Amino acid sequence: IHNGHLHVISQLIEKKIIDRLILVPAGQPLLRGNAPIASGANRRAMCQLAISTLPTGISSHVEINPIEILRDGPSYAIDTVEAVRSSYPDDEIFLIMGADAYSKIDQWHRADELHTMVSIICINRPGFPAHGIDIAALDVSATAVRAGLSADVPEIVAAFMRENRLYDN
C-alpha cells in the first residue's frame, strides 16, 4: 500500500463518495503474473500501518479485511465481492480500482457477473485513458515501490519493509 492508495481513500471518504471502505490485501491475483513477494501477513500488517497514518476522521471509516490472503488458491474479485455482499446484504457495494486495472477488467474471471453485482469506481491515473472520477490521483506505481524505485509509502511502512527485507528495500 502506498501514498497513492492513501490519497484515494482519503479523497473518497472526505468527498463522501463512499461511507466506508473495506481494504482487501491482495491474495494471488492471476493477471499479475507472479506471486506476491510479501506474505499475506506482511501485506495485512503494511495495510494496518498505512491506515494508522491517516487522520482518525478517515481511518475510522476503513476496515481491513484479510479474506483474499486467507483463501487458498487464486483470488478472483468476483469471489471477494460475493463474500462482501453476504456480509453487507443491505449496502450498495462499490469496487474501487485505478484506470490501469480497469483497462483489463474484461479479462477478469466472470467479469460480466461482476459488473452486475457492484458499481465500479474507476480512479483516473496519469498515463491511462480517463474512464472514471478525477480526484487528482498521485502518480505512484506499486510496481516501482516493490522494485525499490519509489519512496512513496508512509515512513512507518517503509521501516516495516526494511525490517522484514521486503521488496529489496
Positions of predicted regions on the chain:
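Nucleotidyltransferase catalytic core that binds NTPs
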Residues: 1-169
